[in-house]
Swiss-Prot record:
Name of this protein: Putative phosphatidylglycerol/phosphatidylinositol transfer protein 1
SMART domains recorded: ML
Keywords, ordered alphabetically: Lipid transport, Signal, Transport
PANTHER family: COUNTIN-3-RELATED, NIEMANN PICK TYPE C2 PROTEIN NPC2-RELATED
Family membership noted in the UniProt record: Belongs to the NPC2 family.
UniProt entry tagged with the keyword Signal: yes
Species for this entry: Dictyostelium discoideum (Social amoeba)
Pfam families xref list: E1_DerP2_DerF2
UniProt function note: Catalyzes the intermembrane transfer of phosphatidylglycerol and phosphatidylinositol.
GO molecular function: sterol binding
Signal peptide limits: 1-26
Gene Ontology terms describing biological process: sterol transport
C-alpha cells in the first residue's frame, strides 16, 4: 500500500504524540494566577492522587494572602473530554467552607472535601477555579487536570 507524503507526516505526528504525551495518571495542577493576584499558592495537594468516582477528593492548599478578604465570588468550570459540563458561580464566603473575613498572611486549609459523584463517567476532567475579592480583583486561579476512574 502506498501512502502519500501528507499521510506519512500525519502518521508520524500521531506516533510522536502517543510517545511524548503521557496520560494523566493522577491529579495535576497549574497556577494560572496573574502576577498581581493577592494569593500566592505555595502548596496544593490532592488525596487520593488517583480520584475515584463515589469517593471524596480531599484538597489541601497553603500559601500567602497579601490582603484581607471580606467577601468575594468563586467561579468553577468543569470540562469532560473537551465538553463543558459545569459552570458555577458562588459566594466565596457562603457555602464553600470558607469563613470571611480571611486575614492577610499565611493561609492553610485541609478541610476541602469534594465528593466525586458515583455516576461520574470515567475519563479526563479539566477544572478551572478562579476566585475574586470584594473589589472584584482576582485572588487566584487554579487549573486542574485529573483522570477519574471507577472503583
Amino acid at each position: 500500500m502506498k501512502h502519500s507524503k501528507n499521510q506519512i507526516v500525519y502518521i508520524t505526528f500521531f506516533i510522536i504524540i502517543l510517545i511524548v504525551v503521557k496520560p494523566i495518571e493522577s491529579v495535576e495542577w497549574n497556577d494560572c494566577s496573574d502576577p498581581n493576584d493577592s494569593f500566592k499558592i505555595e502548596k496544593l495537594e490532592f488525596s487520593p492522587e488517583q480520584p475515584i468516582a463515589g469517593q471524596d477528593l480531599i484538597i489541601s492548599i497553603s500559601g500567602y494572602l497579601n490582603k484581607e478578604i471580606t467577601n468575594g465570588e468563586a467561579y468553577l468550570s468543569i470540562t469532560f473530554d473537551r465538553i463543558p459540563i459545569i459552570k458555577l458561580k458562588g459566594n466565596l464566603c457562603n457555602g464553600m467552607g470558607v469563613t470571611c473575613p480571611i486575614q492577610q498572611g499565611n493561609y492553610s486549609t485541609t478541610t476541602i472535601n469534594q465528593e466525586i459523584p458515583e455516576n461520574a463517567p470515567q475519563g479526563y476532567y479539566y477544572v478551572n477555579f478562579v476566585l475574586y475579592d470584594q473589589d472584584d480583583l482576582q485572588i487566584t486561579c487554579i487549573d486542574v487536570q485529573m483522570n477519574i476512574t471507577q472503583s
